[in-house]
Amino acid sequence: KVIEYDRFQPEFYEDTKTYISKRTSTKKVQKGLNFYNDNKSLIKNVEKKFDIEKELLLSLMGIETNYGTYVGKMDILSSLSTLSFDERRSEFFTNELLILLKLIDNEKIDYKTLYGSWAGAFGFFQFMPSTIKHYAIDFNKDKDINLKDPEDAYASAANYLKKIGWKKN
């Protein structure tokens, strides 16, 4: 199944209008407003600390996981293992698998929670293991980086954008 999903990614065969229309709706906008209203303090704190627009972060979260309501059901260890043996992008996925195994071994992430996309992405913003390693943060200071928690996930996404050079308009 993983290889099948990899071969037929909608980003590569749908035109922009079709792709966007399938991923936007009045219902999704309402879900975004609900997330914003439920997390105003977090959103304002993150925007101030990282200087990243809330509109950008909320849009990304909406597209990636419908505001955390769909984070994927695939075992990402299995997905990355499978993809690492596929010759098309073996080096990339092998590297991601090795990073994930190190994160588990160093107890940075709990292997029992590793369900996400077919491609090995995880959490509310669908971070790949290398992104987790370099940019995920424990924003709520509970000694656990949990990318399925609004505080850690939202702040980690802002941290990622800031560190790769995103500049606020």
Which role does the model predict for each range below?
Residues 1-169:
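Catalytic glycan-binding domains that act on GlcNAc-containing polysaccharides
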